[in-house]
Amino acid sequence: MPRKKSAAKKAREALVQKKVINSNVPTDKKSIDQLQENVTSKSHLLEESSSEDEEINSFQINEEYAKRFEHNKKREELQKLEAKYGEQMANGVDGEGSDESSSEEEEDSDGELVTPEVDAAILRMIVKIRNKDPDLYDSQQKYFDEVEKDVQGSLKSKDGFRSVTLKDYHRQKLLSGEILDAEEDEPMPNDANPTHVEEQERLRKETIAAFHDVNGNKDAVSNESDEDGDFLVKKEKTKKQLEEEEHGYERFLLESAQSKEARKVLEDLSSSYVKQRPSVLVNTEDDENGIKPSDEDFLLKYMMNRGWRTSNTKQPSYEEIIDEVDAENRFDEDAEEFENKFNFRFEEEAGSQIVSHPRNVADSLRRKDDSRKRARDRKKERLEEASQKRLEEVNRLKNLKRKELEEKLNQVIEIAGSKNIDVSKLDLDEDFDPEKWESKMSEIFNENYYEEDSAKKPEFGDDIDIDDIAQVDNGSEDLGSIENKTVEDTGNREKSKKSLRKDIREKKRKIDEYVEEKYGVPEAVIVKNSKFRYQQVAPETFGLDILDILNASDADLNNYVGLKKMTPYRTPEEIARDKKKYGKKKRLREWKKQVFGK
């Protein structure tokens, strides 16, 4: 398969052909053939040259030069970093470590770095200022350079001192073997009970110690009391020790002053020398400025005794300790509250609570829309009016029926001629049935009716029988008997009135019962379109107790008493019959034995 020409070769061939065509060459066949041979030979030369170019383009990496270049690059980068961050990066100390070391440095709030030399230099400068020394006006004069160098040297020496921790101390003791030797020297503890002699010796020592405690002499048992554990007792300082501490720094300055000049200045300014001779700081301008010697002594005492330092000799009271603890707790609470407010400053207040609003807002301008409520009220009023109207119509119907029935019954009683007729058996509005009518008539007009009719007293006319009157006038009865008869007649009349009223009430009651039964309207018809009302049903267990009902299954209960026996529409006679039938104790015992096995 022939090799395809590249784009560069095609471009070169096209360029050569273009030059050949543009040149003044002959157009005969021989010359053209020669020209083609030249072109092919040149194309072969171009192919050879391109292959040589490809060999030249394939290069190799010089490893020695690459190593030297990388080494120089690293040195250049190292120099840049050292110039930017200093020598700390070269020594392996980064900026964070320096920050931590600087943050760990405590602030010199008590002036611990103020050495005696520094105090001497300060006091020397005060003397020169008060005396207006001309050297102060020399700008090249430096007073604190040497002192600062000494302080820096002392700081470096302190930094160079390596603190020994408890862990290092124990490691050193273990390596030296001192702890092992001490353990070997210690006697082995006696776990057994003490002997009688040891017990007596211990009791004797306790008695002696108690005797010395009573007499106030505790020196004899000081060693034993120390062994009891009360050896960490704070030592109370005497008045002399407090005075020595107060003036101790003054003596410390005098003892620790290294240069003779500093010692001389401190001796001159010492409070002990101030009492013996006039002060060195005396100036004629003090009297003019109102400066008193007492003020000068106060200044010297303040400087010499380090008055700016707080005294720790005073023991805080219980109230002060409690107040300090409370103050710390309040500070922590305030800090926590501030932090919470700051962290949640963009959140809404009470965001976790659901905001509720009242249904009836007093100050709201919203128009009340209670049209549906008013419609319900109107409907309720219409129903109540209709129910009241229906009830009035029923009552009017009852009254009319009562009057009509009374007229009919009065007519029947008047025709029958007897007041003891049972009118409750009569139904004057029902359809006429000859057989029922005959049976009711036979019940009403029975033997009692005819016996009452025969026993009825005869009625007399308006004519008066003279014979009867003559017999009364001519009789032998006295006035007492006549009065007794009059009283009896009066009592009979009262009884007849009572019986008459009783008959009227009984008649009215029977008529009302009859009208209510025949023409009475039930309450459900009167109160129409009302809500459903449950019917009150008397509870009945048929001899079962609560545990039997709860423990038994529905099938067992239905087997004992069916649900049909619990319907509310059953008549009282049916309820009484079922209660008598299903409430028998024998049947209940058999059912319990069958269900519960007892």
From Swiss-Prot:
It is found in: Nucleus, Nucleolus. Residues 1-36, 83-117, 177-200, 353-384 are annotated as: Disordered. Residues 96-111 have a biased composition (Acidic residues). One of its GO terms (cellular component) is nucleolus. GO terms for biological process: endonucleolytic cleavage in ITS1 to separate SSU-rRNA from 5.8S rRNA and LSU-rRNA from tricistronic rRNA transcript (SSU-rRNA, 5.8S rRNA, LSU-rRNA). It comes from the Eukaryota. The modification Phosphoserine is found at S222, S225, S476. Its main location: nucleus. Residues 364-384 have a biased composition (Basic and acidic residues). It holds the Pfam family Kri1_C. Keywords: Nucleus, Phosphoprotein, Ribosome biogenesis, rRNA processing. Belongs to the KRI1 family. Required for 40S ribosome biogenesis. Involved in nucleolar processing of pre-18S ribosomal RNA. PANTHER family: PROTEIN KRI1 HOMOLOG (PTHR14490:SF5), ZINC FINGER, ZZ TYPE (PTHR14490). This is Protein kri1. It comes from Schizosaccharomyces pombe (strain 972 / ATCC 24843).
